Amino acid sequence: MSKETISASDRLLPASWSRGNPVDIFGDASGKRYADTLAVLIDDREVDAILVLNCPTGLAQPDEAARAVIGALKAAEPTALRGRNVITAWLGEYTARPARQLFADARMPPTKARTAPSAVSSIGYAIATIKSC
């Protein structure tokens, strides 16, 4: 990530964020925090892959986060996304089902991963597939 991305993220995220990769937006993240952070990462040409991972917590709404991510991806300039991997993974079986349906309805189906390790593996597979083409 560029210094500009880290600086912009400092303004968006809690002070205890990692200031590096991976970018943890914390379990209490609102949809706005998802969208704003995603927009900053999309704008950084040094970032070639983004995994948006939502884990169920009692502090945040997965549907709100999904709507915000869909909005941020639709608002992004098509050229900003060209050649970049953006993968979404909404974890959990039942709590995430409505959010995953929102992605499917927006023609942005999330990965079928239901655990964090399998979500991380999915982005590795996507990058390897693209590089082999």
List PLM regions with ranges:
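Short glycine-cluster motifs
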Residues: 1-55, 64
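Periplasmic-binding protein-like
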Residues: 46-57, 85-90, 118
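Glycine/Thr-rich phosphate-binding loops of Rossmann-like dinucleotide-binding domains
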Residues: 60
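Peripheral docking tails and interdomain loops at the edges
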Residues: 64-133
